[in-house]
Amino acid sequence: MTLNKVKGDIFSQIGYSIAFAVDATYKCDVGICKQLDDKFRVEALLKSLPEDATRWKGKGYCVAFTSGTQDLYALVVKSLPQKYPDYSNIKEALMSLAADVSRKNSILTPKIAMPKICCGSYDKRDWDKIESLIFDAFRGIDCEILIVEKD
């Protein structure tokens, strides 16, 4: 796995799937989730998936889906919008994403763009810890992770 960081717009990263953190209600009304919902109707798409694929079971998980031609990964890291994600749920969601990426990388090296998940003004997690979880989850997997920070 290679991890790179850039400043810019996550939507201008051509050829990248987009991963983002969300709660289990799939409410997309703030931050990057709101932007994704405005562009790709993320909330409605997630809520339309079969219940087994999207049910909160007390630990983090990843939901892979597509909107038009854009592949998306919702990292479900907490039960409700007003809760703070704990690192174990973030780790579980990243491990679920890594497992999905590992299954799909038979032809092309997967490329995933994501913001600094769970580190915004609301969730307030420590980026150094999150970055370490990303490295742990993707160790040995052939993929590229691009962390996109706003300008």
Locations of regions flagged by a protein language model:
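Macrodomain-like recognition of ADP-ribose-binding/processing modules
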Residues: 1-151
